[in-house]
């Protein structure tokens, strides 16, 4: 298994909660990621979205763009409009030689609404998922044809959150719609992370190695507390600091021949969990787990 290790800037800056945003410049964020050992970073709000400006900054720290979030609206939107919306990021990512755009469906999502309890997440009918899967397939085929594939991010508090919802989307979409497997989000949603890999390994093109603190998740009142409440309480963390068995997760991915990026992505309070410390811990754990496989490139 050939693996590359990246990290997301959400540990330094949280776009949804200002209170969880450390006052760190782009250069300092990249420096800390490099010091921790990472060679890739997903984009965030402080990234200039053009390689003329960003390229020299990345080169200074030996970091490449290993993906980045796009707030999708195709569930309730039009394919042609979605093409227009993603075009600028697509051109930037092609220039950056990024592996994919992380497509997160935000239509009807409550992931950024602090007042919306977890139990009020959007729920789609089977018919709606079928129609959505068809649209996503056409859109994913177009993106790949343009030279920049998308990786679909199942996400807490969004329309495709649970294992059953993901199964239905995968069953009603084509191979062009690749999957971003996020262990933390799937575990938080009550899914069996290894079973999800078993079922959808052929579609997985990108991996977020997000861990969870089971003790925090178990105590959440889903009828009262929101996704952002859970984040503030520390539901997520890096591998080696949480409850998930990443030995089994990485072994299962390797058994199916996964090769690509493993991205540490764990939003939490930077005052309680300093980003550099967390980055070092996450990187060290992934290196430890992959050492026997001699797989990090």
Regions found by a protein language model. Give the residues of each.
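Hydrophobic faces of well-ordered beta-strands that scaffold small-molecule active sites
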Residues: 3-9, 41-43, 65-68, 101-103, ...
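Acidic (Asp/Glu)-rich catalytic clusters
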Residues: 1-2, 31-35, 48-67, 88-98, ...
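Active-site acidic/histidine proton-transfer and metal-coordination neighborhood
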Residues: 79-178
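Active-site mouth loops of central-metabolism enzymes
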Residues: 11-24, 73-82, 121-128, 237-240
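Acidic/histidine-rich catalytic cores of soluble enzymes
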Residues: 41, 133-243, 293
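Conserved small/polar residues in nucleotide/adenosyl-binding loops
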Residues: 296-297
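Short, acidic/polar
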Residues: 18-32, 82-92, 189-197, 246-249
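Conserved, mostly hydrophobic/aromatic
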Residues: 7, 33, 41, 58, ...
